[in-house]
Amino acid sequence: MKIKEDKVMAVVKELFRGEQGGAVSFGDYTLNKKTKKEDIEFSGDLYKVKTFYEITKLEKNGAFVYESVPGTAVENFAVKEDGISFQVAGYRDCEITVELEESTQYVISFTGEQHGLMETNRSGKLSIGVELEEGKDVEVSIVKR
């Protein structure tokens, strides 16, 4: 799979980047082969990222945090007391799975518009479909109800 370089919005070429305030940015959906970076220290935690055009996955201290199929670029992924928020970009629509509190309801919003209420399963995972258009990012907000 070859992504057109002229249409790509910002990807995280270094695969993982810590941001001010504790947020993280990660992922490069333009890569043709699976690439990973492990044992990344940031704010007292250890991160691991795997990414390429088919999948992007983030782990924190050995635990699942984020996964998208196909791969994406994620900026300003911030975990807050009441949920998470981030910007995501990719070359086509994707399914994103995140780890949150188990059996809890969350309001899902894309670029400021509410798109419904979802409940995590007993393991705390929540999966959402995000419509992506190459060259444009989508702001995702998942807030506890």
Tell me the role of every PLM-derived stretch.
Residues 74-76, 83-86, 116-118, 127-131:
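Beta-strand-rich interaction surfaces with strong enrichment in secreted/lumenal proteins
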Residues 2-73:
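Catalytic cores of secreted or luminal carbohydrate-active enzymes
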Residues 36-58, 66-68, 94-96, 120-145:
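C-terminal beta-strand-rich structural cap/linker in extracellular carbohydrate-active enzymes
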Residues 80-83, 96:
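Non-catalytic accessory regions flanking glycosidase/transglycosidase catalytic cores in CAZymes
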Residues 72-79, 108, 140-142:
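Generic structural motif
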Residues 87-104:
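Surface-exposed beta-strand/loop patches in extracellular or lumenal glycoproteins
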